[in-house]
Structure formats: structure tokens, C-alpha cells
A protein has these predicted regions:
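Extended, charge-biased low-complexity segments
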Residues: 1-50
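Amphipathic protein-protein interaction modules
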Residues: 46-113
Length: 116
């Protein structure tokens, strides 16, 4: 077990995102997805450690287009269903951002990943 020198940011869907999920998939239009259940469809990002929360907020602002597209593509890659307006204000309406300053890796094996 080790503390990792990263800041974790989790992004989960708020009501507008859940409504969009339902609209794009009829199987979920029956109430299977709610805001609390949408948490399972969230994402976690490991960022460099930031001394100030303002620096982290600036990172989100600088990367909002990529973050928004990433969240949408995790649900469907059909960009025709994506909202046209994907700016910072809309992102903040559609998603909840949680910051975790302490990240602990409890696994014994090395972290593996693929480049995006």
C-alpha cells in the first residue's frame, strides 16, 4: 500500500447528463438510470498534485472540451446525439466534480494502462 503523488478527480453525471443518457438509449428510459445510479458510469482522473484548488479548477477549464467528450463517448460514440453546446457552464450543469487530495494505491501489482 502506498500514497500516490497525484490528485484524483472524479466526474459523475448530474440530472441533465442522466436525462441525456435516457434519451439516447431506450432501454434506460424505463427509470433504470437515476442520478445516484449514474455514479457507476463516472470516471476518475489522476492529475498532478496541485498546491491550490484554483490550479486544479484551471486545469479543468483548460481541458473541459476533452473531459466533456470523454464522458459522452463513454456512453455512446454517436456524436450526433451529443449536445451541441459543450462549454464549461454546460459541463458544470451536466457533471459533478469531486476532488480527492489523498490517493492511496492498495494493490500489490503495478499500474497498467493504455495511451489515449
Amino acid at each position: 500500500m502506498r500514497v500516490v503523488n497525484r490528485t484524483a478527480v472524479t466526474i459523475t453525471g448530474a440530472q441533465p447528463f442522466v436525462d441525456w443518457m435516457r434519451d439516447t438509449d431506450a432501454d434506460f428510459n424505463r427509470g433504470a438510470i437515476t442520478v445516484p445510479r449514474a455514479k457507476a458510469y463516472g470516471s476518475a482522473f489522476l492529475l498532478p498534485e496541485f498546491d491550490l484548488e484554483e490550479d486544479l479548477q484551471e486545469w479543468v477549464e483548460d481541458n473541459v472540451a476533452w473531459l466533456f467528450d470523454f464522458q459522452l463517448s463513454a456512453w455512446t460514440e454517436n456524436e450526433e446525439t451529443w449536445p451541441e453546446n459543450r462549454d464549461l457552464a454546460t459541463f458544470r450543469e451536466w457533471f459533478r466534480i469531486d476532488i480527492h487530495s489523498v490517493v492511496v494505491d492498495v494493490a500489490d501489482d503495478d499500474i497498467e494502462g493504455e495511451e489515449l
